[in-house]
A protein has these predicted regions:
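Terminal beta-strand-rich extracellular "head" domains
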Residues: 33-47, 51, 56-154
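Generic secretory/membrane-interface signal
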Residues: 1-2, 82
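Glycine-rich, low-complexity segments
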Residues: 2-38, 154
């Protein structure tokens, strides 16, 4: 197999991808926005008001990108904070973002996950907790839970 090293002329001559390259497509996007601040001092994960969405997949062979765009913040007391995403009543362990000894007013992001192979309506949630010793964990106003259903290309 020959190795081709593109130069500037070769690259500028590329106008489109060949038709034979497979691509997926976005089927649907749904969002839920947190419209007011939410805080908790509970050491168990607590539902964040506004970050919950029921969604029905259009095809069980599709996949879903599930994410929350936004931040959690530690209050001014010693201790830690954490967030996790929940699918159909079960926490998605891989989405946990925690700091057990967070600095004052530290911000952490929420996690993300890819979910597939289900049918029917399921619930998606963003949850936060305050690790013992911390007076509060805050989910900032404007955090948005997003569900993107897509058809994979493979």
């Amino acid at each position: 197999m020959a190795i081709i090293k593109p130069n500037n002329n070769t690259i500028s001559a590329i106008t489109a991808l060949p038709a034979a390259i497979p691509t997926g497509k976005v089927v649907a996007v749904s969002t839920a926005e947190q419209t007011s601040g939410f805080e908790t001092n509970n050491s168990s994960y607590t539902d964040v008001t506004g970050l919950s969405l029921d969604y029905t997949m259009q095809s069980s062979s599709n996949k879903i990108i599930f994410t929350v765009h936004g931040d959690i913040q530690r209050g001014s007391q010693d201790g830690g904070i954490g967030s996790v995403l929940e699918f159909d009543g079960s926490e998605i362990t891989e989405t946990k973002v925690e700091d057990p000894a967070a600095a004052d007013n530290l911000y952490l992001p929420y996690g993300s996950a890819i979910v597939d192979g289900y049918s029917g309506s399921k619930n998606f949630k963003g949850k936060i907790r305050s690790v013992p010793g911390n007076s509060k964990c805050i989910s900032r106003t404007g955090s948005t839970l997003t569900i993107i259903e897509y058809t994979p290309w493979w």
